[in-house]
Amino acid sequence: MRERMVTWAAVFQRNAMSWRREMAASVLGSVIDPLIMLFGLGVGLGKIVDSVDGRSYAEFLACGLILTSAMSASNYEMLYGTYSRIYVTGTLKSMRYAPICVSDYLIGEVLWAAYEGVVAGTIVAVCTAFLGYIPGWSVIYILPDILFVALIFSSTSLLVAAISRGYALFAFYQSIAIAPLVFLSGVIVPRFTGNDVISGMIHFSPLYRAVNDVRNVVYEGRGTQVGPLLLLSLLYASVMVFISAKVICVRLDD
């Protein structure tokens, strides 16, 4: 187990050293977009929408954007960064000559992508607290929700990257899966309730669960209940890594 953890740390460190050269652009890119949405939609529509759940629309939107920033950063790193290292630049293929297991390498990649998501989500949370849309104390309490979302979507995007034959699939994945999930999970508008089947499915969406939990913390001051969900996310990530490792090994050995 110790050797495996050393591998995870080595992959994480390698990515961190590479990321350090482009850290400013990466962080700004992950943070500016949700802040633009916050001002554009939150302040703009806030003049039209009186309130949502008893709060201003900007406050309602801020809670969701914290988590979508974590989701987007994790997705982007996994879909483009990890995919390139596996299939384009040959990083993984080169590392396989060393005594390294593909699944251990992928765990390191998932941890790195999740870390980027946590960084992006935390920065957006701090910015929204500074602007007065969420209480400053709540930033600490919503960190588990940010980590939960980052883990779930980094491991999901790993499987998408593993099966993809090119970058074109990523745009399809974003359009057919991520965008509807954002709109239906209560990020921009209250949760969709127009159809019982769809509403029931959204109720179990990880993004909806996390957004709902963050709003409970921010609105009511209740402690986060994300502990069991974090354990579930670790189990889910393990399954995604196992499946992705099988797919990648087959493709690299062709």
Curated annotation (Swiss-Prot):
User: In the UniProt record, does the keyword Plastid occur?
Assistant: no
One GO cellular component term of this record is: ATP-binding cassette (ABC) transporter complex
* Domain ABC transmembrane type-2, residue spans: 25-251
One Gene Ontology term of the biological-process aspect is:
oligosaccharide transport
Pfam families this protein is in?
A: ABC2_membrane (PF01061)
Topology in membrane: Multi-pass membrane protein
Q: For this UniProt entry, which segments traverse the membrane?
A: 25-45, 60-80, 106-126, 133-153, 169-189, 230-250
Localization terms from the record: Cell inner membrane
Q: What job does this protein perform?
A: Part of the ABC transporter complex NodIJ involved in the export of the nodulation factors (Nod factors), the bacterial signal molecules that induce symbiosis and subsequent nodulation induction. Nod factors are LCO (lipo-chitin oligosaccharide), a modified beta-1,4-linked N-acetylglucosamine oligosaccharide. This subunit encodes the transporter.
Question: What PANTHER family has UniProt attached to this entry?
Answer: NODULATION PROTEIN J
Oligomeric and partner information = The complex is composed of two ATP-binding proteins (NodI) and two transmembrane proteins (NodJ).
The protein's name is: Nodulation protein J
Q: Which organism does this record belong to?
A: Azorhizobium caulinodans (strain ATCC 43989 / DSM 5975 / JCM 20966 / LMG 6465 / NBRC 14845 / NCIMB 13405 / ORS 571)
Instruction: Give the taxonomic lineage as stored in the record.
Output: Bacteria, Pseudomonadati, Pseudomonadota, Alphaproteobacteria, Hyphomicrobiales
Gene encoding the protein: nodJ
